[in-house]
Amino acid sequence: MKAKEVSLVALFVALTSVGAQISVSIGPVPLTLQVFFVILAGLVLGPKLGFLSILIYDILGALGIPVFAGFSGGIAHILGPTGGYIIAFPIATFIAGLGRGKVRYLTSLMGLLVIYLIGWMWLARFVGFNKAFILGVLPFIVPDIVKAATAVIIAERLQGNT
């Protein structure tokens, strides 16, 4: 990897970590800017480097570095009720990064879908399927679509594709 790529990967690890701290509690799954930076990482860095940046974020958190929401970290967060969302982040980043041009909106939404599906199924192990959907998916649909669309617009501006 070139120095610029290493720097960009590190930047998105940091941005995602900061985004996790901008949080509003609305149940067991907090509303944060993590999803925004997860999608933006894929759009700006592409699927491979985006995946790497968010995988590093997940690994740092699993190792106990307080990068998750509420300045938390540790393997318990990966194994706990919201762990599925965290596990899904690198996959969503990869999918979002596959998009170019107008397809970016679609791949960003597909990335969100992956986060929802994995997170919902994981959370359902703790609270049941219906309650997991009500707590862990439904309240996030509109805010996350707005975040994903904003990420696409910002990525296009950063890359000069207006």
UniProtKB/Swiss-Prot annotation:
Identification of the protein by name: Probable biotin transporter BioY
Keywords: Cell membrane, Membrane, Transmembrane, Transmembrane helix, Transport
Subcellular location: Cell membrane
Functional summary from the UniProt entry: Probable biotin transporter.
Similarity section: Belongs to the BioY family.
GO cellular component terms, semicolon-separated: plasma membrane
Gene3D superfamilies from the UniProt entry: 1.10.1760.20
